[in-house]
Amino acid sequence: AYYCFCEKAESEEDSGDFDRAEDPCRCLSQQEVAAQLAAGKPYVIRQKIPHTGTTTFSDASFGEITVENSTLDDQVLMKRDGLPTYNFANVIDDHLMGITHVVRGSEYLSSSPKYNLLYEAFGWEIPTYIHCSPVMRDAQHKMSKRHGDPSYEDLKAQGYLTEAILNYVALLGWSPRGELAEQEFFTLEELVQAFDITGISKSPAIFDLEKLNYFNSAYLKALSPEAFLAVAEPYLKQGITNPSIDLRLVAPLVQTRLNTLTEIPPMVDFFDRLPEYSNTLYLHKKMKTNEENSLEALQLVVPVFQAMTEWSFQAIHDALLHLAEAQGLKNGRIMWPVRVAVSGKATTPGGAVELCHILGKEETLRRVQQGIRQLTPQA
């Protein structure tokens, strides 16, 4: 190392970005250094990198890497304010903490030779380096919180399960080997057992939100009914404030239809309040329904519902199917108009029977009768 009294910007001090061949301080004698110090001239302390030869280091992911010493700069070790630079402090801190493996981004590969020269200068054992390629948001840009890319906390707030995030992120830039090579889903314990440094990729991985959605959807579907209700309940309550709606009945309807938990509120809000809707929802090519025959279907349904003494899923199912059969109609000719009338939506979690069962007899009849009024031509 040597004292450097040259006037340089602080950024130059930190980066070591200068032409050391022309730096007069590199070759100052002890007497010249003493004179400068006695004069109170500010200084930094730089690492004296050899001009010739090579420095070789081994990386567990990238293998053995050799660089020409002539390409390395004389990095600053101590700044003018007397504080160590990050690189210098990092080496000392890692040694004092007994760090055996240094895992960091591949952008730090170029710094490793200078780290090694410091370890060698101190006579310390060089740790194992594992440089990992960055996670990219696209082919050109790294993921960055500064540019709006999500953190773990952001993903949690967006309705992703911890287990799904962990599983997906573990497979970014790493892949299992051997008999596990084709396996996609891992518990944390399985990841611990399967992980091997040799599986780390040298190429950057691109963060694919659709793939994360795939993982999250699979994890949501795999939850037991009780476990799913526990994670979904806060979101169900955002969409449904009516205490008469049994969330335990709603939860199974949405569990298999989700990518994220935040999709739940707009999916179930019609249970709380019937939205305004267009009569065009009654038009369904496959079900062969239109406004006219939908009106007829709802008018047939009202007395059937009114006469029912048991309001269960099976009772509603049997009553509607019996009505369709008695009228010589396909089931869809009855089911679709009822579904639209009670939900006001083109797509719903669950069909007509499930929705009517959850809404209850009184609310179902109120909505069906409202549908009749809406479909009835005005004189």
Pin down the residues of each PLM region.
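Amphipathic alpha-helical segments within well-ordered protein domains
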Residues: 116, 152-153, 213-216, 233, ...
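Structural motif
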Residues: 155-163, 202-208, 241-250, 325-333
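Charged substrate- and nucleic-acid-binding regions of tRNA-handling and nucleotidyl-transfer enzymes
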Residues: 314-376
